[in-house]
Amino acid sequence: MVTQAATRPSNDAGQDGVTEPDILAVARQQVLERGEGLNQEQVLQVLQLSEDRLEELLVLAHDVRMRWCGPEVEVEGIISLKTGGCPEDCHFCSQSGLFSSPVRSAWLDIPSLVEAAKQTAKSGATEFCIVAAVRGPDARLLSQVAAGIEAIRNEVEINVACSLGMLTAEQVEQLAAMGVHRYNHNLETARSYFTNVVTTHTWEERWQTLTMVRDAGMEVCCGGILGMGETLEQRAEFAANLAELDPDEVPLNFLNPRPGTPFGDLEVLPAGEALKAVGAFRLALPRTMLRFAGGREITLGDLGAKRGILGGINAVIVGNYLTTLGRPAEADLELLEDLQMPLKALNASL
């Protein structure tokens, strides 16, 4: 017998009162019980839920995360090895050399890189990501990365990740040989919306880098930014794109409009809409590490951070981001302690 709780009137129901299964009831069976992620059409239904069902969604997303990922939260810190001067035109990014942004090109020295890794490890983090604002690494950058990784390994017990743009097959092998644990390269948005965000390279070029990274044995980190003008349909498409890729980690960023960039005048995503996206992406990716990344402070604030961690998130970036300020590491760690969520241990990350 179908109960009233399991069905709701369809938005497309005709005068005959046709009903369809409630999407959250479907998700409980499909995702929570069987561990099968929602498809694109189903994710769209979740994104279209009314605001009065947000808490119900977040509770379900948290239950899914606890069942299929467990209670541990992975903590990561990031550092910019090479800041600014990027030749690409990613419309959200203040590090592009094509825009009138206040960010200027600069390199970080190896001792500063090691010190940042030490401070990251002291926070309880197990992952330290070295980032460079480039289309892809040249010989000089790869040499700096190699020296930095070696210096960090000699002094700090932490996994090292990298985010260096698009790679050649040879560069992928070089990074794997350096011992890079995880490689980040975000698809940023749905395939159908990508040309509204970037025009100097293609979505397919990014995808190719990610598949080569996986084939080389490194973990794949791939997410994007929500709130760049995409429709709910495209947001659902993006979740499906990520599910097809099946990365080890998905960082969810929320647009923090930067002065001087083409997206500098966009509105910040409403908190409820951002949290609904968090829950929807968890239901699409039940077994994937889902990380709170940039923009959550301006979009969600302190209360939103708690609701997100109780709504499907199981990883965080602590401290500052590349060109914007983040929450203090102590604030996130205190929140996790209050919620009695253990930090992922280093040996569990290897």
From Swiss-Prot:
This is Biotin synthase. It comes from the Bacteria. Keywords: 2Fe-2S, 4Fe-4S, Biotin biosynthesis, Iron, Iron-sulfur, Metal-binding, S-adenosyl-L-methionine, Transferase. It catalyses: (4R,5S)-dethiobiotin + (sulfur carrier)-SH + 2 reduced [2Fe-2S]-[ferredoxin] + 2 S-adenosyl-L-methionine = (sulfur carrier)-H + biotin + 2 5'-deoxyadenosine + 2 L-methionine + 2 oxidized [2Fe-2S]-[ferredoxin]. HAMAP family: BioB (MF_01694). Pfam families: BATS, Radical_SAM. It is an enzyme of class 2 (transferase). It comes from Mycobacterium ulcerans (strain Agy99).
